[in-house]
Amino acid sequence: MKKLILLLFISISFLSCSNISEREKKINATEEIVLKVYDAQLSGDVETLKSLVSDDFTMTLTGKLDISGTYDWDSYMEFSKYFGSLLIGEVGGEFTDIISGENAAVVFLNGKMEGIGGKYENDYALRYTVNSEGKVSNIKEWLSDILLATQLYGEEISGQHVDPDKRFK
């Protein structure tokens, strides 16, 4: 009898450990969708990208640059062409990490490109929001404004030099 109870307990424990919760399934599905969108973005596969985003898709570039703002699909395509015109060569990026939730995931990458101002290596965080139909409805992008301005726009940023010994006094 003890063996039967022990065997039953082990079987139930094994089955409960092997079952993925609904939440985990949703997180995995979100991550899969987001990585497909990310790959399509980076490779320039507009057809695949379009098939994975919602009809009310928006993309938001944070910051204080002239290109910062929220774009719908058509204006995002125009923005992408403009961004590409600032580069020498292709868009490049090294995926570094992803943090996924049930309805959104944040992808971290190191952009590795060359712009009119020289080498452009900017750290990016992109939050992809996935709607109830499994389509990406919004991408929100964070990056260094200053690096973009100097390396892609060719602007010079000059600040006042502060003596390190007097900086916080």
List the model feature ranges, each with a label.
Residues V34-V37, T48-K50, F57, Y76, ...:
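Hydrophobic pocket/interface hotspot
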Residues M1-K25:
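Bacterial Sec-dependent N-terminal signal peptides
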Residues G93-I98, D123-V130:
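Hydrophobic/aromatic beta-strand elements that line small-molecule binding cavities or substrate pockets
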Residues S85-G89, M113-E121:
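Short, cysteine-centered beta-strand-loop-beta hairpins and adjacent loop/turn segments enriched
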Residues N138-K169:
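Low-complexity, intrinsically disordered terminal/linker segments enriched in charged
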